Amino acid sequence: MSETELLVAREYISRVPALLEGAKSSIQVVQFVMQLKGKSAKMSSRELGIKLAAKARDGVRVQVLLNSAGGGWRAPSLNRQAAQWLRERGVEVRTLGSSRTCHAKMLIIDGKVAIVGSHNWTPYALERNFEVSVLVRELTCVSRLTGHFEDLWKVSKPLVG
């Protein structure tokens, strides 16, 4: 198994569900924008949200950090909706709550595997856009990403609204 794997376009959504299902102790997510509600009966981003909620129910610590500043268009509104939906299902959700934009997109599973790249958890990003992310298993890199997540989590606060 390679220490890095390129996930182009829809390859991300074909790999992430199994990674989420395999989580044993922790899932850490950072997203610029997350859309879990919408008109589509089956949205890929909603499926990821459902998997996060199921893992939280199973006792896995699930932490989601969303952007709250800037972003224009609908990002803050979509993030508030996603935060409420996730919190109602036992997921810890926070925001940096500053004037600085958190544009990172990151997923860390059990401190052992991480994905970092351009994929937001929205139907467009997961199904239509030209996105690229990298799956990393190299533990020094994953450890550094985990440390970065934990630093952001410490200065974050619950998303209000």
Model-derived segments and spans:
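Signature of lipid phosphatidyltransferase scaffolds
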Residues: 9, 108-161
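Structural alpha-helical scaffold elements that stabilize or flank donor/cofactor-binding regions
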Residues: 19-20, 107
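Aromatic-Pro/Gly-enriched surface loop or interdomain linker
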Residues: 1-18, 143
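Conserved beta-strand termini and adjacent loop/short-helix elements that scaffold enzyme active sites
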Residues: 7-9, 65-67, 96-98
